[in-house]
Each structure stands twice: as C-alpha cells, then as structure tokens.
C-alpha cells in the first residue's frame, strides 16, 4: 500500500480440458486485473484482461494447481478525472509488450520491475505455453 499498490483480480468464465487418463488438466479462466495508482500526478485506473492458464493435476484424490501462467490480452489506462490533461510518455509506454503495456507502465512508474516476456494473445510465448499444455496432457 505504501508504494501506491491497489490491485484487484476478478475471475470470470472457465473451461477445462482433461487428459485421457483423467489425472491432469489444463484450465483456462478469464480474468481482469484492475489497478489504481498515481501516474505523473494523476490518479488513474488500469484495466487488463486476459486468462489464467493453469496446469492442474489430481494427486491422492484431490485436484490442485501445479502452475498458473497469466496470458495478457489487452489493457487500457484512464485518469479518474476525465477532464485531466493526461499525457503518457510514449517512448516508455511503447517499450512494453502490447498485451499489458499500460499495466507495466503504471507499475514501472510506481517503482516496480516488470517482466517483459509474458505470454500475450499472440506470439511465440503463448504458442510455447500452449505446446507445454499439450505435452502436459499427453504425458499423464
């Protein structure tokens, strides 16, 4: 809280793909991340939508999440005051991946180090994740 971190994760619809053995699964859950914070003196909300891509396994009769990987699809930033003369540093903004660039922008402005190789809607990172998911299901 002292660094201006006010974040909420909202979970939406879910789909599950089971392995042939019935002991492993890939679960995808729609999610929205909202973060409020100060950016260059303006209070702003960032909204980022995506999915949680979960590797799940049944062990000793109970299901659990083995790995959760977010996939960032798109985001936006809005000043709380719609009349604010609000300008983002375009060089900084465009240095971040498209799927979560506004979320990365506010977090960087708040002093956090942001990973820049996270899976997005398209690209090598998400294709690699999907392949890992197929391998997970096929080697159950």
Q: What do these predicted ranges mean?
A:
Residues 31-37, 56-58:
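Beta-strand elements of well-folded, non-transmembrane domains
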Residues 40, 62-140:
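Terminal "cap-and-tail" regions of soluble proteins that handle hydrophobic small molecules
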Residues 1-33:
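A solvent-exposed, acidic/Ser-Thr-rich amphipathic alpha-helical stretch
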């Amino acid at each position: 809280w002292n660094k201006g971190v006010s974040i909420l994760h909202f979970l939406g619809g879910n789909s599950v793909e089971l392995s042939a053995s019935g002991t492993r699964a890939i679960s995808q859950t729609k999610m929205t991340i909202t973060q409020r914070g100060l950016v260059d003196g303006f209070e702003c909300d960032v909204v980022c939508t995506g999915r949680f891509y979960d590797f799940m396994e049944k062990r000793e009769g109970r299901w659990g999440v083995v790995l959760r990987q977010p996939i960032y699809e798109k985001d936006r930033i809005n000043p709380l005051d719609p009349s604010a003369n609000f300008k983002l540093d375009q060089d900084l903004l465009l240095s971040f991946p498209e799927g979560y660039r506004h979320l990365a922008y506010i977090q960087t402005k708040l002093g956090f180090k942001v990973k820049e190789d996270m899976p997005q809607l398209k690209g090598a990172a998400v294709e690699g994740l999907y392949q890992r998911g197929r391998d997970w299901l096929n080697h159950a």
